[in-house]
Amino acid sequence: RLIEYGEEHPIEILLVDESSRALVGDVKAEQVMVLCDGELVDGPDIFPAIYKYQSGDCIMREVLASYCSRPVEPALALLGSRALVVGIYSPVNRCFKSSLALTIGQVMAKKESVLYLNLEEYSGFTRLINSEYKADLSDVLYLYRQGGYNWMKLKSMISNWGNMDFIPPVRYAEDLSQVAPEDMAQLIDRIARESGYDRLVVDVGQMGRGALPVLSMCNVVYMPVREDYISAAKIEEFEEYLEEADDAGVRDRIQKLRLPRHTGIAKQEGY
């Protein structure tokens, strides 16, 4: 029946177990992958092997990663409108910026498809959700610099937390410093245009004046602020910079937020 189906319908990926491995020779499939139990099997037909005793999300990421290792169309993308890019940024420290970004992402994800992107040097994200990842934003940036980026490859690096999808943050802080702010902005724009998500939430790190190109890609920028004298001085200095840069577009999209102070979250379980 599968052979007949392959004659009439294109099969891009065929995922089989080891017991069916010898039976797929007559099936017309672009790529065959084998679910294995950990032992290497020799044979004339060498198919990519995927360890089957792992979570479904991990299996799916390995399938997509293997599929994307083949040459693909450079312009491969999901059709649809550009995602609304929501930036979370503040020149003020310890203002619950990342808490706000994660909350906005989870709330939006209840009704829309959301992708969360963290651009901080030290996000603490993997410890927050107690998970480790084989691929992260460092790999995305490498692909983009090498000209090998496309949406299918990015999809293999995306994980899920609650209702929200996310790209795991960089492993090493220096990976962010090796990317020009303009290139980062172009990457964000490309993800927004090609990913098929409704919303792209970007937690913008302390990029100095390099944050401006990234903020320019955002449809709206939420800026948590504090009312103490030092924080107010930082906000005023940032606004003066926007005036000097003559970037009314970014200035008009900024919405300042004064968040309630909370001290009850002391452990990762609180999130």
PLM features: what roles do these ranges have?
Residues 1-25, 206-207:
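A short, well-structured beta->alpha microelement
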Residues 57-62, 186-271:
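Conserved catalytic-core segment of NTP-binding enzymes
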Residues 119-193:
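P-loop/Walker-type NTP enzyme "switch/lid" segment
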Residues 85-148, 203-204:
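Walker A/P-loop NTP-binding active-site region of P-loop NTPases
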Residues 10-12, 29-30, 164, 197-198, ...:
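Local beta-strand N-terminus motif with an aromatic residue
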Residues 19-23, 39-41, 93-96, 172-179, ...:
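Short acidic, S/G/P-rich loop/turn micro-motifs used as interaction or catalytic elements
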Residues 14, 32, 49, 200, ...:
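Short, well-ordered beta-strand core segments
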Residues 16, 23, 27-85:
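Extreme N-terminal, non-catalytic leader segments
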